[in-house]
Amino acid sequence: MSDGTRKRPHVWLALGLLAILPGLAFAGAGKEPKDPWALMMLRFEFDNDTFIGSDDVFTAGWSVQLHSRVMDRWNRGYSGWIGKVPGLGDDGEGGRVVRWAYGLSQIILTPSDISIETPQPDDVPWAGTLGLTGSWWSNDNRKLAALQIYLGCLGPCSHAEQVQKFVHEDLGFGEPPKGWGNQLSNRMLANLNYEYRYKLYAVDVEAYVPGRFAHDLSIGGQAAVGNLLTSVTGQIEFRFGWGLTMGFTKIPDPPGLGIVMEPIYFDPKAPLVDLYHWRIYFNLVARSRWITYFAPAEGGATESGYHHPALDSYPGEHQILFGLHLVRVPFGMHVTYYRYVGSEPPGIQGSIDWINFSFEYRF
């Protein structure tokens, strides 16, 4: 084993997960399949930049999510208010599908040099967020609308310090972080996000099955309002592969910065075909985001008493995402690379690119 590999145990972790997942998918092959319309989903997402040789700015993030089964109409608890949000209605029995998801998430941000104990006013602040989300969406194979509510906190209440120290020091996955005494102080966070997407081009429905190549093209936009993020985003997404699902791209933005959902589509009027076969497909997303407020970038009071200045500009306004999706019900794995386009904003010393790993189990 080389010294470089010893210093990067996350490489072995990633390879282990890639090796284990196919075996897990076959483990339940002999069991009687459950009604596909009754399947709920548990998803775990892990975000990190060390997989691309960096460990700063957006250092890490994770979320655990519970997604509802696929429904073709809202139940009484949601129809009276979610169903009245523009685009989020259902068409009654046999129309669009609707779903909800709830999640818990954490984000960790650090300066480029985590070995420095003193304040670093010329770099990203030490900061962490912890939040709960509720998401609701309605879609078919042509259009999608989604709404999300985020409630959380920024500061020591996020326990980002304890999590990073446990991973770096107790597990030995990185250099001991020494500057958490300078993290941004506690503040409450709340955000409301709304998204709409529309498919410009889609192949015939018969092509959305395992073993057949399919592709489609969509555009969309998202608006976020709150004291975590206030922004407007526009995007274009291209999907292609073998066994492409109907619906839209799964974009694994950290909850609050994006919307937690599973935007696939099943036609309620048609039987599900080959649900339990392998699907492998890809997506390419280009988007631009106009940001007017992002809590960690605003600086502010810190636990050591100094005032961290705001960043000169907001990071991550122009992005290209490339995703790989491997699914065989009840398991799924998704890998998405976030590539930020353009020069890095002043005040950011390190790279802001990162990778998301998502693991799913339907039950």
Where are these regions (language model features)?
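Short loop/turn motifs that connect adjacent beta-strands in outer-membrane beta-barrel proteins
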Residues: 28-39, 70-98, 139-146, 200-217, ...
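Outer membrane beta-barrel transmembrane domains
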Residues: 112-115, 237, 243-363
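Residues that define the transmembrane beta-barrel architecture of outer-membrane proteins
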Residues: 56-62, 126-130, 145, 186-192, ...
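Extracellular/periplasm-exposed beta-strand and loop segments of Gram-negative cell-envelope proteins
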Residues: 121-123, 160-169, 175-187, 224-226, ...
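Transmembrane beta-barrel strands of outer-membrane/channel proteins
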Residues: 42-48, 100-108, 149-155, 196, ...
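Long, hydrophobic/aromatic-enriched structural stretches that serve as scaffold segments
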Residues: 85-163
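N-terminal ordered "arm"
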Residues: 36-81, 332
